[in-house]
Amino acid sequence: MKAIFIILAILMVTQAFKMTSKVKSMNMSRNMSKNTSTLGTKYTYGCPQTNTPTQQDCYDAMYYTFMAMCDLYPDPEHPMFPSYDSCQEESDSADEFYTNQCGCGGYGMAAAHDQVCLLALGVCIPE
């Protein structure tokens, strides 16, 4: 699972470089976390933008990460588009990432992962 998350991150960064011509102008906070990126989307990808995140900060960061993926890969047929299956498969990896990289330990990120992912998918899947 960890390998899938790492490969996903590498592919997202690679895609971001390819999309530099499509990057929209944004106002970015100067105190963004080192584990945060915009990847050319209107959504922030990665950790909460605070050194001491609350549970809601962590859930919001996870939600915006899924929305960034939907923004980067709007075609549901694209292999990188988040899916219902990936929501359930990546819970442990997400918990490990948000706990170890973002300071979200103790907030039940694995349990929240499926709900937050499905909530984001409900917004980004075209009808």
Curated annotation (Swiss-Prot):
Which key words tag this protein in UniProt?
Pheromone, Secreted, Signal
| Secretion signal, residue range per the UniProt entry | 1-16
* GO CC terms: extracellular region
Instruction: Give one GO molecular function term.
Output: pheromone activity
**Compartment(s) where it occurs, according to its Swiss-Prot or TrEMBL record:** Secreted
Propeptide, residue positions: 17-42
Q: What does this protein do?
A: Mating ciliate pheromones (or gamones) are diffusible extracellular communication signals that distinguish different intraspecific classes of cells commonly referred to as 'mating types'. They prepare the latter for conjugation by changing their cell surface properties.
Q: What is this protein called?
A: Mating pheromone 4
The organism encoding this protein is Euplotoides octocarinatus (Freshwater ciliate)
List the gene name.
PHR4
